[in-house]
Amino acid sequence: MPKDYSRTLRIADQIQRELADLIRNELKDPRIGMITLTGVEVSQDYAHAKVFYTTLHNESDNFLVQNGLENAAGFLRTQLLHRLKLRVIPQLHFIYDESIERGVRLSQLIDEAVASDRSEKETDST
């Protein structure tokens, strides 16, 4: 089992590298623009791959990016077939990764709490 698990991780990493290259160099869809692939999770049977991404677009444009990636999934899968030496090329499922936005929000909340504590200490000391 551990050997199979590490193979799954290696395949996921390879798919992420190849997809990043394909999206950067081969896709001409203006809806996609600049995106960053943050991770790929491949199922144990290699039939499905969840591709996590972030984008510099605002939230209203995320729908367009998602739609563009879903439309390009067949093309990307075909290109992966030519680049990877696998019997099964997984079906690609693109998922917007909100973890970076959540991290920024948490950081802002922490900064606000620290600033609030400082202002309370300053008013208490005077």
From Swiss-Prot:
One GO molecular-function entry: ribosomal small subunit binding
Protein name as it appears in the record: Ribosome-binding factor A
Keyword Zinc belongs to the record: no
Compartments, record wording: Cytoplasm
The protein's role, per its UniProt record: One of several proteins that assist in the late maturation steps of the functional core of the 30S ribosomal subunit. Associates with free 30S ribosomal subunits (but not with 30S subunits that are part of 70S ribosomes or polysomes). Required for efficient processing of 16S rRNA. May interact with the 5'-terminal helix region of 16S rRNA.
Record PANTHER family: RIBOSOME-BINDING FACTOR A, CHLOROPLASTIC-RELATED (PTHR33515:SF1)
Family according to the record: Belongs to the RbfA family.
Key word Cytoplasm present: yes
Cited PROSITE patterns: RBFA (PS01319)
Signal peptide: none
Gene name for this UniProt entry: rbfA
BP term (GO), one: maturation of SSU-rRNA
SUPFAM superfamilies referenced in this protein's UniProt entry, alphabetically: Ribosome-binding factor A, RbfA (SSF89919)
Cellular component terms (Gene Ontology): cytosol
UniProt entry keywords in alphabetical sequence: Cytoplasm, Ribosome biogenesis
Subunit structure: Monomer. Binds 30S ribosomal subunits, but not 50S ribosomal subunits or 70S ribosomes.
A Pfam family assignment: RBFA
Principal subcellular localization: cytoplasm
